[in-house]
Amino acid sequence: YPNITVEVVGKKTTAGIKYIQETSSNNGTDLFCASAPDAFEVLKGDGLLAKYSSKVKGIPKLVGSYPINDPEGFYTGFAAAGYGMMWNNRYLKANNLPAPKEWIDMADPIYFGHTGMSAPSRSGTTHLTVETLLQGDGFVKGWGKMKNIAANFKTVTARSFGVPDGVNSGDFGVGIVIDFFGLSSIGSGFPVGFVYPTVTTLVPANIGVITNAPNEKNAKLFIDFLLTPEGQEILLDPKIRRLPVNPKTYSKAPKDFPNPFKDSSIGAAVKFDVQLSKGRY
């Protein structure tokens, strides 16, 4: 689409929601895109998303046990997203630390001053990560584990991308991240690793048309393109490394790249309750 210019405005998820809400009476935004499905439930509940169901073929109904698209048709999944931990191999070696495998590992006192996370009040993906822990372990046990993990933090970043930046640079050794932060850092050549812990979930990253979008036709074309084979393949770019929702795209993925359509263990432990998460947003 060489004649269509796309302007992207990057905001924290919470700030993006607030912006759409505050400008709804004179809306100038066509699309909202985020990794956290609960954010779309907030906008849908406010009547700020327009229905659109793409006719692009090849996209299954589910990724893991979670619907790829909103059953009511207000937003569309274009990538899958899991949550876990990334680490800097050089940092861990220099500090004689093991790579973590489960959330509880990050509560070990050996990691004191060596870990980081972004603020869940400012990052939609971090909110979802904490919510996953609460839903997977139960509210009381989950918060207990999260508090013990937080006791080891060297820093809490204001933006979610501050965590991979800190791990990649060696400012701290281990960070709690959405999967594509770790996978894209690996793809870009940083000396890092990434793991999905057992208690994690798998949900779609979504995109939706805003109510009264000034360029509604082109907004729908953009969603369609994201779902085409060409659009899905872009997700495999080393600087992006998101999980496509078209299973056929994985034939072009690098070796050892996660494939949720073949590895049923990714996100199997937690069936994410988006309404519960929305209520605690």
Regions found by a protein language model. Name each.
Residues 61-62, 81, 114-118, 145-150, 156, 225-246, ...:
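Periplasmic-binding protein-like
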Residues 27-32, 50-87, 104, 113-114:
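A structural signal for short loop-to-beta-strand junctions that line the ligand-binding cleft
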Residues 86-91, 202-217, 234-235:
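A bilobed periplasmic-binding-protein/Venus flytrap-type ligand-binding module shared by bacterial periplasmic
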Residues 132-196:
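Ligand-binding pocket segment of bilobal, Venus flytrap-like solute-binding proteins
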Residues 1-41, 164:
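Early extracytoplasmic/lumenal segment of secretory-pathway proteins
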Residues 43-51, 70-72, 184-196:
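Ligand-binding "clamshell"
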Residues 238-244, 248, 253-281:
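C-terminal capping/gating helix-and-loop segments adjacent to ligand/active sites or protein-protein/ligand interfaces
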